[in-house]
Amino acid sequence: MTMTTNIFNAIILGIVEGITEFFPISSSGHLLIFTNILEMKNNEIKILNTIIQTGAALSILLHFKEKFVIFLEQIFICKQITKKNDLIYHHIILGNIPIIFIGLCIYQYIKYLSNFYSIIYALIFGTILLILTEISKTKISSNKNIETPQILIIGIFQCLALWPGFSRSCATISAGILSGLKQSKSVEFSFILSVPIFFGASVLDVINNFYDISINNIPMLFSGFLSAFITSNIVIKRCLNTMKNCSLIPFIIYRSILSIIIYLFFMH
């Protein structure tokens, strides 16, 4: 492929990532579909996907910058905890412990799950979880404040994000609601929780794929990053407003249709 084609492909993938990352519909599933449509090489895909996810993570960081400033202040200068700033560092660290531990243990095996067979099953199981969440959310007494047991439950469910196609948002938002958290709070916490994981995974992937990065790839990687960052910035606010109160049924239907499309067009 020419450099122009690579840059074009990277921009497309960045847009796909920016649109799909924040909804419970699996950005990894969509990226696999588009990398197949664009006929991209395997050695290009891994590092590019990592870079564009970093672009999406940066947009979350900027959107919640006040909370992350408090997070850093609580860690490094021991800022006094108030009702306004809450135990933000405690929430973020505790919520990410499960996926850090599990992720490091199975990191070398995750690549074997990046195929259409695995992604279809992940989409199906994630859809079932959304159905259970939608049915249960009117019956569960919601709590505005997040407690330690809920953080642990959400953190454990977040490990399902290691399965490409499941959707991190699907796992964490569902876990929050099922554990008794208001949907609006579940959505916000899901977004905030993702930032350290995205950046941590990016560093790990860059280290492990360092020799696949060449000077010729830099324009492609930068284009993908910028595309994902810009798209994410456009989408994130609208997504937050939509996801905080909406029904999960549209996402259940969408995931079901996506599973059928993958089966019919990419597995036959």
Swiss-Prot record:
The keyword Transferase does not apply. It is found in: Cell membrane. It is a multi-pass membrane protein. It catalyses: di-trans,octa-cis-undecaprenyl diphosphate + H2O = di-trans,octa-cis-undecaprenyl phosphate + phosphate + H(+). Its main location: membrane. Its EC number is 3.6.1.27. Coiled coil: none annotated. Pfam families: BacA. One of its GO terms (cellular component) is plasma membrane. It is an enzyme of class 3 (hydrolase). The chain crosses the membrane at residues 7-27, 87-107, 116-136, 146-166, 187-207, 210-230, 247-267. InterPro entries: UppP. GO terms for molecular function: undecaprenyl-diphosphatase activity. GO terms for biological process: cell wall organization; peptidoglycan biosynthetic process; regulation of cell shape; response to antibiotic. Keywords: Antibiotic resistance, Cell membrane, Cell shape, Cell wall biogenesis/degradation, Hydrolase, Membrane, Peptidoglycan synthesis, Transmembrane, Transmembrane helix. HAMAP family: Undec_diphosphatase. Bacitracin is thought to be involved in the inhibition of peptidoglycan synthesis by sequestering undecaprenyl diphosphate, thereby reducing the pool of lipid carrier available. Belongs to the UppP family. Catalyzes the dephosphorylation of undecaprenyl diphosphate (UPP). Confers resistance to bacitracin. This is Undecaprenyl-diphosphatase. The gene is uppP.
